[in-house]
Amino acid sequence: SLVGSEMCIRDRLSQTEKDMVDMVCDNFDDVIVIYNGANQFELGFTDEYPQIKSVVWCPGTGNVGFNALGKVFSGEVNPSGKTPDTFIYDMTTAPWWNNGEKIEYTNLADMAVEGMNAGSPQVYAPAFTNYVEGIYVGYKYYETAAQEGFIDYDKTVQYPFGYGLSYTEFEQKMGELEEKDGQISVDVEVTNTGDVAGKDVVEVYYNPPYTNGGIEKASANLIEFAKTDLLQPGDSQTVTVTFDVEDMASYDENDAEAYVLEKGDYVISINRDSHTVLDQKTYTVDDTVVYAGENKRASDDTAAVNVFEDAKGDITYLSRADHFANYEEATAAPASAELGEPYVSEYHLNSNFDKTTYLNDEDVMPTTGADNGLTLADMRDADYDDPRWEKLLDQLTVDEMANMIAMAGYQTAAMDSVGKVATLDFDGPAAINNNFTGVGSIGFPIEVVIASTWNKELAQTWGECMGKISQEMGAEGWYAPGMNTHRTAFGARNYEYFSEDGVLAGNMGANAVEGARKYGVYSYIKHFALYEGLSLIHISEPTR
C-alpha cells in the first residue's frame, strides 16, 4: 500500500517496501502484488521477480469495495476493468517531468500573502507552471512518439491506457463503417472465446492525417467506447458504436484559431488498448472543414476560439514536427523564473486595486429592484440570449447580489426578488459530506475506480446514488464530479478525477451528472482545469 497524501505522493518503492518485496519473494513462489494507490506508479520491479505472477490495481474502493478483492482472487468475480491512465517504467522520461509543479516568480516575492493550507499557516507567492506538452498528455504522447520512432515503446510503457486482463479471452470483429447525417456507426461483434463468463470493453480510436509542422495531432485518440454485458463462454454480443465526424477535428491555435477537420484519410480502429489494434477501417474526408464563426460544430454552443493568449508565455511547446525534434528544448526545466513586462506591472496594478480609478461621471447605475414580475423558475430552459434575463437581473437588489457572492460556500443564498430559495451544496466526489454538521454518507469508490470500469451505465448508477443520498440529506447541490485531467502522476487530486483522457473522463462525468439529476440534484463539475494540487490552487483559481 502506498502511503501518501496531498502533500506527499511517491511514484516508486521506498527502501522499506523493496525489502518487503524481497522477503516475500524469497519465501513464496506465487506472489500477487496489490497496488492500492490512485496515481500511476512505477511497477517495473514486478518484471524483475519470477515469483510475481500478477499485479492487481485496486485504488480507493470506499467503505466496502475491498470485500470484492477476495472474490476476484478466488475466481468468483472475473475482472473487466481497464486502465484510465498510462503506466510507464520511468517517470523521469515523461514530457511533464521538469514542469510538473509550481515555480515561484523570483521578482514577485514582495507580492506573497499569508494563508492557510490543510489547517496550517502557509505563505503563497505568485507562481507558474508550464504546460509544455500541449496536447501530448498520457497515451497521446507515447503512442505518437512510438509511431514517429522517437521512443522504444516496449521499454517505455509497461501498461498502456485502456489495458486490463481477464480470466477469459475475447474476440472482436469490426463491421463496415456507416455514415449518416454526420455520424459514423460501426458494429463490433464481441465473442467470449474462453471458458469463464466475463465482460469486455470495445475501445474505438482514430488516427487523423498529419502534415509535418502542421496542426498538432496525436496518432491515437479514443473517440468512443462501450462495455459489453456479462458474456457466457461461447456467447456473442454485437455492440454498435456511434460518434460524430466533427469529433475528429483538431484545434488549430496558430492559423485558423478554430477546430479544423482536415481532408485526408482517418484510420478508425478497434483496440485492445491504446497500443494494440485489433482491426481498422479508413474514413476519408474529401474537403477540409473549418469550424469557425457561424459554422460551429454542432456540439458547441459557440465556435471555439483562442483565449488566454497572454498566458502562452515565451516558452517552447512540444511539437510532433520532425519526429519531436524539439523535445529536449520543450521539456527542459524553465531557464528563468522571472516574470517579464508588461505582466509584472499589471500584477502590481491589479494587486493594488483602487475602485475610484474606475469611476466615470457618465456611468449610469444599473437598474436594481425593478418589479418586472419574473421568477427564476420562469427562466427554466431559457436560451442564454433570451431578453428576459436582463429583466430578471434588473429585479435584483444590491444587497441580494452581495449576499449571493458572500454566502456562496456550500450553499447559495435566497433572492426573494426573483423567487429564488436558499439551497445547500455538499462535498464531494467519493462521499456526501456536510462540512457544517459533520453528517456524511458512506464512502464510495473514488473516481479513478469508476473510470477503470469503462462502464457508462455504472457511472450513471453512481451518480444516482450520490443524488439520492444528497436528497435524503437535504442537499440540492453536489460538489462533484471532479473533472480535471491526470496530467502527471503526482496530481494530488488525481483520485478525485477520472483519467488522463478527456473522452473517457467526459463520458463518465456526464453520466454521473445525469444520474444525480434524476433526484433533482445539480452538479458542480469542479476543478475543471489547472488544479494538480493544493500548492497550485491559487494559480488555478481565476480560471476554475
What do the PLM-derived regions correspond to, one by one?
Residues 1, 5-253, 260-270, 274, ...:
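Glycoside hydrolase catalytic-domain context in secreted enzymes
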